[in-house]
Amino acid sequence: MFLPVGYIMMAAGLHHESGRDRKAAANAGLVLAGVYAVLVLLVYFAQTTTVRTDTLNDQASRILNFRRGGLIFNYDLLGYGMMALSTFFIGLSMKPENKTDQWLKRLLIIHGVFFPGCFFMPMTGMFTAMADGESGNGGTVALLLWCLFFIPVGVLAYRHFRMSRENTSD
């Protein structure tokens, strides 16, 4: 539940640094970061409260249990789709001044590629097998690949803000 808050802080910092000529992209990125946070926090809160602590009947479990690929799972994918769209716009708003910033901008824009999959795949019924407990390891593999992609974004953002702070404190 900490990732959405941390991501909003990163998006807000990059929004603050964006130039006037790129504020529309930065604004879109920041608003979409908020949409992402709301969706994902609702999903995680439901999972850690209702799903974990209550005995759910089969119908409720199909809707609320993330592992069964129902409504809550689809909301989670929608949330991460909004994050992908947010990173795309935040990346467009950046004016890189060094290699670290160039890589951060590239990764943020490339991360936007995840949006169509997160948005449209649930509409295809691709995850309906999960409802019957027939899911394989595809979701776990996808999550691990996403983590391998997004960890460098966090590291580069940390370096970006650390360098920004050092340059302004002179």
Language model segments and positions:
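Hydrophobic, aromatic-enriched alpha-helical segments typical of multi-pass transmembrane helices
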Residues: M1-D170
